[in-house]
Amino acid sequence: MEGTNNTTGWTHFDSTSNRTSKSFDEEVKLSYQVVTSFLLGALILCSIFGNACVVAAIALERSLQNVANYLIGSLAVTDLMVSVLVLPMAALYQVLNRWTLGQIPCDIFISLDMLCCTSSILHLCVIALDRYWAITEPIDYMKKRTPRRAAVLISVTWLVGFSISIPPMLIMRSQPSSMAEDRANSKQCKITQDPWYTIYSTFGAFYIPLTLMLVLYGRIFKAARFRIRRTVRKTEKKKVSDTCLALSPAMFHRKTPGDAHGKSWKRSVEPRPLPNVNGAVKHAGEGESLDIIEVQSNSRCNLPLPNTPGTVPLFENRHEKATETKRKIALARERKTVKTLGIIMGTFILCWLPFFIVALVMPFCQESCFMPHWLKDVINWLGYSNSLLNPIIYAYFNKDFQSAFKKIIKCHFCRA
């Protein structure tokens, strides 16, 4: 989004020879143009390829054709429009360090820039909203999660984008002051610096969606953590509860040392239920030995030996390790959720927050605020790079998309 003047400041060195100074400046400018053209060209091509692969994967792979992926596909189409319609003109403006296409193409460029970038940001907000509904209202929302609903959400993103991008072209440009400014700065192509429009556009395109995304993903994390922990608790409760046999020493009778089977205890058992005990006990007849085949328990029965007062331990806790393992798995899932949400929000904020801070602040302090032109350019292209990163975050990390991409690369769909 061209919120600032896209010009690059170069340092000129004084020299006794004007020719030497001019030659040095041309060499620096040529090297800058070559390096910049290569970097921006690579960014544009990678962005086009990545988003085109996402669109092709959803169109060709039936397993990917669901509402959640339709939203991701629409995001890819929007970022593809940014890559094809906006970035080439922005790159030309950046490399030449001046606008050479005229005023009407400048107006079209600014409108497309704001429309596509705003729609891309709002798509991220819609995807967050869809995920929030899916995880907080899984049963009810599954009935409402239809392609028609997805189409409505996508339409809203474009309508909001139009409401933000059209005013600069149709309203602001018709003002006499704006026309006079355009004639005075024919080599520049920048958005209007009107303070009221700046507040309206920056809050509508970024700050409100950012706030909504932070709230939604915060609640998604809380809901996901609650469901993970509830699943672990349910798994523990579903374990079959058996009986931990509490035995009193007075109920036992030791056989004489001469008995063939050595020491054993006479069967006199009082069953007492304890939580989470799984086991199999072979009950012997009167005068026979009592054999314990296998016992598993989630809570250790710390029972004393027969020659001490109290009850006698017959069972070992075999499920403690399993329970601890499940807790570790649950913790790993929570960490993965935090990592995923952190990547989504971190990338979005890193790419767009610097740009919108500059876009909001600079119109109010044009004379007192100073920022190097190179820093403005870096911030500007950092925002554009979000169109390259979106397909990586939302699609390439998805295993279903990965298999579809492999088919596309191997031209599996072509043979089919």
From Swiss-Prot:
Role, per record: G-protein coupled receptor for 5-hydroxytryptamine (serotonin). Also functions as a receptor for various drugs and psychoactive substances. Ligand binding causes a conformation change that triggers signaling via guanine nucleotide-binding proteins (G proteins) and modulates the activity of downstream effectors, such as adenylate cyclase.
Annotated protein name in UniProt: 5-hydroxytryptamine receptor 1A-beta
Extracellular side of membrane: 1-35, 96-104, 172-195, 365-372
Transmembrane segments: 36-56, 71-95, 105-129, 150-171, 196-218, 341-364, 373-397
Cytoplasmic face residues: 57-70, 130-149, 219-340, 398-416
Family assignment from sequence similarity: Belongs to the G-protein coupled receptor 1 family. 5-hydroxytryptamine receptor subfamily.
GO biological process assignments: adenylate cyclase-activating adrenergic receptor signaling pathway; adenylate cyclase-inhibiting serotonin receptor signaling pathway; positive regulation of MAPK cascade; regulation of behavior; regulation of hormone secretion; regulation of vasoconstriction; serotonin receptor signaling pathway
Source domain of life: Eukaryota
Primary localization class, coarse: membrane
Residues reported to bind serotonin: D113, C117
Activity regulation text: G-protein coupled receptor activity is regulated by lipids: phosphatidylinositol 4-phosphate increases HTR1A-mediated activity.
Organism this protein belongs to: Takifugu rubripes
Glycosylation sites: N5, N6, N18
Keywords attached to this entry: Behavior, Cell membrane, Disulfide bond, G-protein coupled receptor, Glycoprotein, Membrane, Receptor, Transducer, Transmembrane, Transmembrane helix
Motif NPxxY motif, chain ranges: 390-394
DRY motif (motif): residue ranges: 130-132
GO CC term (a single one): plasma membrane
Binding site for 1D-myo-inositol 4-phosphate: K339, T340, G346, F397, N398, K399
Disulfide bonds: C106-C189
Localization in the cell: Cell membrane
Membrane topology summary: Multi-pass membrane protein
SUPFAM superfamilies: Family A G protein-coupled receptor-like
One Pfam family of this chain: 7tm_1
GO molecular function (one): G protein-coupled serotonin receptor activity
InterPro entries to which the protein is assigned, alphabetical: 5HT1A_rcpt, 5HT_rcpt, GPCR_Rhodpsn, GPCR_Rhodpsn_7TM
